């Protein structure tokens, strides 16, 4: 059963402006929003702003799918990239919210084109 659905669109230029801005501001943003593994993945790519935008969209979509629980931190949501499709790991208050909803599986899809990054998150489970 589908327990939650979240969708988000991020303009890549918005992230590019942050990355190209004052280094201290960019670092604060990256440290507050992205886990070290996400940063390593994005920073190793030529299109790093696009990669960051997709991950930011994934986090926003996940929060929407969870019902916008209070206190969830960006770092409670981590986009992981193995050899296949990306996945979303939940920790902290995000994991607590998922447990309360009865989430058994999190589906994530990312795409980017024409200057935007899009993410969709579907939460699947049996319910509370």
From Swiss-Prot:
Keywords associated with the record: Cytoplasm, Fatty acid biosynthesis, Fatty acid metabolism, Lipid biosynthesis, Lipid metabolism, Magnesium, Metal-binding, Transferase
GO CC terms, sorted: cytoplasm
Reaction(s) catalysed (UniProt annotation): apo-[ACP] + CoA = holo-[ACP] + adenosine 3',5'-bisphosphate + H(+)
E.C. designation(s): 2.7.8.7
Record's subcellular location: Cytoplasm
Swiss-Prot/TrEMBL cofactor(s): Mg(2+)
EC class of the enzyme, as a word: transferase
Record bears the keyword Lipid metabolism: yes
Listed SUPFAM superfamilies: 4'-phosphopantetheinyl transferase
A single GO BP: fatty acid biosynthetic process
Membrane-crossing residue ranges in chain numbering: none
Binding site for Mg(2+): 8, 60
Keyword Oxidoreductase applies: no
Single GO term (MF): magnesium ion binding
Predominant cellular place of this UniProt entry's protein: cytoplasm
InterPro entries from the UniProt entry: 4-PPantetheinyl_Trfase_dom (IPR008278), 4-PPantetheinyl_Trfase_dom_sf (IPR037143), ACPS (IPR002582), Ppantetheine-prot_Trfase_dom (IPR004568)
Family stated for the protein in its record: Belongs to the P-Pant transferase superfamily. AcpS family.
Reported function: Transfers the 4'-phosphopantetheine moiety from coenzyme A to a Ser of acyl-carrier-protein.
Protein name, entry field: Holo-[acyl-carrier-protein] synthase
Taxonomic source organism: Anaeromyxobacter sp. (strain K)
């Amino acid at each position: 059963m589908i327990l939650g659905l979240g969708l988000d669109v991020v303009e890549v230029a918005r992230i590019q402006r942050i990355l190209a801005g004052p280094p201290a501001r960019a670092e604060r943003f990256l440290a507050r929003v992205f886990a070290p593994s996400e940063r390593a993945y994005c920073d190793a790519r030529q299109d790093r702003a696009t990669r960051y935008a997709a991950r930011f969209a994934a986090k926003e979509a996940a929060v929407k799918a969870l019902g916008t629980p209070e206190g969830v931190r960006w770092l409670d949501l981590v986009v992981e990239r193995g050899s296949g499709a990306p996945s979303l790991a939940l920790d902290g208050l995000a994991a607590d919210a998922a447990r309360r909803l009865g989430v058994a599986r999190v589906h994530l899809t990312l795409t980017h084109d024409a200057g935007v990054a899009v993410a969709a998150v579907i939460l699947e489970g049996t319910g509370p």
